Every structure is written in C-alpha cells, then in structure tokens.
Design a protein with these regions (language model features):
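Small cysteine-rich, disulfide-bonded extracellular modules of the LU/uPAR three-finger superfamily
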Residues: 1-94, 100-136
Length: 136
C-alpha cells in the first residue's frame, strides 16, 4: 500500500510566519474519504472525517512529542505512534490530516487503501522515522 504525504500552502505560510513545530499544539484527524487541495485553509475543507463514534472523536487527537532535525534540509518528526482504541463496530480511515490547533492544515496523508480497526482493536498511525515531511 503506497502512502502519499502532501503539504498544504497554509503550512508553508505558517512556517514562514515563525510557526514552531516543536511547541505548537498539533492534531491528527482521520478521514474515511479525502482529497488533497493545496489551497485549503481548514483541515475540514475537503473530505469526510471519520464519524464521532466507536472510539474515534471528531477532530482526532493531539500528536506526541515532535522534533525538527537537520541544517540544510529540516525533517519534521513525531516521536511516538498515535493510537486509537476502537469500540463497538470500529471504524475505517483512508487518510489523515495533520493540523495546527486553530484548524490550519499542515499535511495530508493518503494511506492508499482503507485501514480498519474492529471493535476492541487498535488503530495505530506509526510515523515515518525519517520525518513526516521535510523542507530544504
């Protein structure tokens, strides 16, 4: 399954405006259907967020500790996996969006296929060791 990550124009604008990757509150939301539009100004602009039920809460959840490594090319990293525990019928996601707490989207992650967590199981988003995205 090919995973594709794309940056939003608003993320680049936020970075240029001294947005701090390591101290800002950043969330990840799951989508059952989603498309990428580089000019979207809100994480909810395109796509259908996973329904608020069965272990998923609208808006997703805050991601863990973040670091930024490198000098010429900077890689934005998230140190721990983000995990949801499915209840009831569980839920399915096809994409995720990272966004700043104000709702400004940073990047769109397309999993390339539906990923399902059955009730009682976990749905884990393991972040790439090399970084979620890089600039440079």
């Amino acid at each position: 399954m090919a995973v594709t990550t794309s940056m939003y124009n608003s993320a680049l604008a936020a970075l240029l405006a001294a947005f701090n990757w390591t101290s800002a509150t950043i969330y990840v939301a799951l989508f059952s259907a989603s498309t990428f539009g580089a000019t979207n100004a809100a994480y909810t602009t395109e796509g259908t967020e996973v329904v608020n039920a069965n272990g998923y809460t609208t808006g997703g959840q805050a991601v863990g500790t973040r670091t930024a490594d490198g000098t010429t090319t900077v890689a934005a990293k998230i140190s721990a996996a983000t995990v949801w525990t499915a209840t009831g019928a569980g839920f399915t996601a096809h994409a995720a969006k990272l966004y700043i707490s104000a709702g400004i989207p940073l990047c769109h992650i397309d999993f390339g296929a539906d990923v399902t967590a059955s009730g009682g199981g976990t749905w884990t988003l393991t972040w790439a060791a090399g970084g979620v995205f890089s600039i440079g």
